[in-house]
């Protein structure tokens, strides 16, 4: 193969953007040396020809003139890559495709553009000249490599406010970096500067644009906080910890709620004992002075505190530290008596006699100048065992002590004593007494469990555990024996360890429930008899099952009998209560005893030999006034008048007397009341009256010995009876 020499002739192509035409406009003529040998046809392909954007470039097929059909925009496409082709009349290529690069040359048709409309930055107040503040930035779409069309220069057009100097800042014309050029930045004077920035292409000589640069002057701690006021006075009661004493206010010209403004307080003098603390209120920035512990009026009555204040941030310059003076007066209050020691330990035997002194526990009153009297009382005595003398604090045994009581823990009984002074108001101090009870041998050994099940033939011994609530040496080793005749059928033996006992049958017994009396002895000979409930089963060896004999369940009848007895007792108590309440009401008698004949029955004419019914119950004649029968008399027309209203019988027994008086008065004034052809009972005393029956009255043929003058004194209701028997003559 032999390399073929390239015969294309393609000069470089540069096309200015934004040309005015006319279009199409010739750019360059493409020629092949083969055109002398044969007729050549030319064509182009690529971007701008047959690829988007299509139709920008064309070529004359026979002459090879390449043309542009419209204005170009370098900012849109700055270079076009195309390929030229040469073919013969029969369509065969006569040249290799050749690359064509069309370069669009720039024109200054775009002005610079800032990347932001407003740039924001900050610089601390007091910054020295040369301190960098911020950077502004602008871009230009034009070419900044081959031309100056895209080369931007920055400048400051104006500054607001124009103090303390009209040119406080400068800008690097090439980079856009802003920096301080003059001293005197003071946030308390000017908090913010606004600069008008300009960007110009052609290195400052071309198109321009503007933007704003806002520079905030940040605060530094160049102002010391000051107390306002500088002197404080306060009073606090003694013995009050964490009590607010005073609030100290400060002023600071620095930016609020910044480290340069937030205050830090300290007590620099007068707080040698650490009685006070001071903190900063984060909301108000005030210094809050509090008591760290309770003050003692008797020890010190006044404090003079010196308080200093600084900021969280250190001072940017050398500044003096402000101080304030706080005078705190301590107010005297009635302090509670103080037990010494606050926890008293004592040891006593648990069997001390009642009234025996156990310990003396006293308190001292801190208010010595007041010479108050102290009274001692028990504050907490869970078991109620102790008593304390109100004047000298001597503690004695009120009840029998018991080391084994559930109120003790590890043989120690805790009680709380109170010491109350006679101040206004009284103050109470507390002291704790820990009373260690020394063990005595007051409990005998006990077996567990107390219910066993055993076979009556070849039984397996039942092993019981021995417990003793006392402490050594008042415990084991233990001894055991049977009592109350239990040894006739049972045997017992203490185990090798000394804390168990074995119980078994020595002769067969019928299946039943038995009581075995087991006596256990401790080392000191203290004994106790315990009843073991032994269920003997009809079996051999170890109990597998024990069928119980049927028995009559008497639980329900017993419960019913108990309920009946309780109800009967309640009924008796209720009757006794009613009787007592009746007797408490004392009423005047309705009639004098000598005039009261209601308990006597007189005979007013006998026409036969006596009553036919000798056992008539007089109670059947009794009816209340509210249930009396209607009586109709045929021989006399009843008067047309309203019947009286009778009061209903009250439920309260205490009002029975008033009930009788009111209804008797209503009956006496009732013109419709008897005597008619009816029978009334004026008083009935029950079955216990002297005249149990009307048959007890002897019949008489004459009533000459009777005096009926007293009937005139009985009122309107007996007027008719008095007329009948008052002045008539006896019939023969």
Swiss-Prot record:
The chain crosses the membrane at residues 555-580. Three calcium ions are usually bound at the interface of each cadherin domain and rigidify the connections, imparting a strong curvature to the full-length ectodomain. Residues 6-114, 115-227, 228-339, 340-443, 444-554 form the Cadherin domain. It comes from the Eukaryota. GO terms for molecular function: beta-catenin binding; cadherin binding; calcium ion binding. It comes from Gallus gallus (Chicken). Residues 581-732 are cytoplasmic. InterPro entries: Cadherin, Cadherin-like_dom, Cadherin-like_sf, Cadherin_CS, Cadherin_Y-type_LIR, Catenin-bd_sf. GO terms for biological process: adherens junction organization; calcium-dependent cell-cell adhesion via plasma membrane cell adhesion molecules; cell migration; cell morphogenesis; cell-cell adhesion mediated by cadherin; cell-cell junction assembly; homophilic cell adhesion via plasma membrane adhesion molecules. This is B-cadherin.
